[in-house]
Amino acid sequence: MSQQVIIFDTTLRDGEQALQASLSVKEKLQIALALERMGVDVMEVGFPVSSPGDFESVQTIARQVKNSRVCALARCVEKDIDVAAESLKVAEAFRIHTFIATSPMHIATKLRSTLDEVIERAIYMVKRARNYTDDVEFSCEDAGRTPIADLARVVEAAINAGATTINIPDTVGYTMPFEFAGIISGLYERVPNIDKAIISVHTHDDLGLAVGNSLAAVHAGARQVEGAMNGIGERAGNCSLEEVIMAIKVRKDILNVHTAINHQEIWRTSQLVSQICNMPIPANKAIVGSGAFAHSSGIHQDGVLKNRENYEIMTPESIGLNQIQLNLTSRSGRAAVKHRMDEMGYKESEYNLDNLYDAFLKLADKKGQVFDYDLEALAFIGKQQEEPEHFRLDYFSVQSGSNDIATAAVKLACGEEVKAEAANGNGPVDAVYQAINRITDYNVELVKYSLTAKGHGKDALGQVDIVTNYNGRRFHGVGLATDIVESSAKAMVHVLNNIWRAAEVEKELQRKTQHNENNKETV
């Protein structure tokens, strides 16, 4: 009988560590709701003790996610576990995930401790976590380089202390698949109480073996796989969840396991994570790359036309990729736009129809036909920028040529006031940015600039993603338009609004702190 493999997503915790700019609470919630819709069993959404922002993110997601178990990370430290529990207590169901290093190298050089002390600490902290929840996961950091006898001792002790899931990470992506399978098999042979916990694996891709190691572990008896959408994560990344999920589905004949994932949501979730995290998906990426279902060889094309199974082991439709793209025009009404969004699987709560339709009409007037990928791009950008704006791009004009210095004139609405400036720059985009900086007097440093075509051909939309540095903090902005300079300007305005909102939040926190201090003095 087929057994279920629990899918544990860590996109918002381990995955986010790879990003150049931290995600906002709103962006994290968007991803969390998409993961819930996809059907992940557990989502690890942050490290609450690390910052007030992470605490708020975990708490917000814990409050809103209902159908997936929400998890937070904690070191084997009392405060970590207490803060994690505090952030999670609003959840329908939650898990505390605590960890400590177990390899001789980590114990000696990082912890400056002994294996016996590590075991004692693990027991104490697992018991502390069990005071808050019956669902406690314990991880043996660097398990891949831990002698099996030592690892078995730690695992047995953690289970006796109350851990319900034991995670075996290949923290540095060092282990070969046959070795990793041997570790899992070895634990089943050596740990007498192993039947009282789920064995989980968490692999990294430093040698390109994360997915292979996870599948080898599943074949050896692991029943939870941890990973991130699109494989994002530190260094070379985490195990790509979409790859493991589809491998389990396609090769159920030899693995004899299944997941509870809604496979039709894989494509959408992957695209959303890519866009929000500003991490483009390589064309040759398995499962979700733009070339994953493309056939250029004449022999292959002929074979696919005769029978898709000749060269396709899965279909685009099996991951929710609809290859039939319909187009709308400026004559299409609101009902037609809503109907198409419904057909693509979007709920009304995921976008603002009024804003989407306004943006759709402007785009349709410019390019004539609007395709599915255009609508999705407009909906995504609208969601990112739907919060109140202090800055708004009112007008811009650029002049440049092969022998001319680029000049830009920009008019920007700043609250109730409209300001205008002109500036020169190293190209039209830089000129626009210089003019915007003059208007706002923000000393914004551009760290990263990327341009992605959304759609096909000469009428494709250009999405600009930028990462900026302002007062020691990283801010991400995104802009979308048929004109690249306009996209770039909108991305910078998005950054400015994010900076302004962050400053307003800081002012409010200071006001509350001062209010509390005044109350103490009164008492």
UniProtKB/Swiss-Prot annotation:
Coiled coil, from the record: none
Entry keywords, A to Z: Amino-acid biosynthesis, Branched-chain amino acid biosynthesis, Cytoplasm, Leucine biosynthesis, Manganese, Metal-binding, Transferase
Cofactor(s) it depends on: Mn(2+)
Residues annotated as transmembrane: none
SUPFAM superfamilies to which the protein is assigned, alphabetical: 2-isopropylmalate synthase LeuA, allosteric (dimerisation) domain, Aldolase
Pfam families assigned to the protein according to its UniProt record, in alphabetical order: HCS_D2, HMGL-like, LeuA_dimer
PROSITE patterns tied to this protein: AIPM_HOMOCIT_SYNTH_1, AIPM_HOMOCIT_SYNTH_2, PYR_CT
Region (Regulatory domain): 392-523
CDD domains from the UniProt entry: DRE_TIM_IPMS
Protein name, as recorded: 2-isopropylmalate synthase
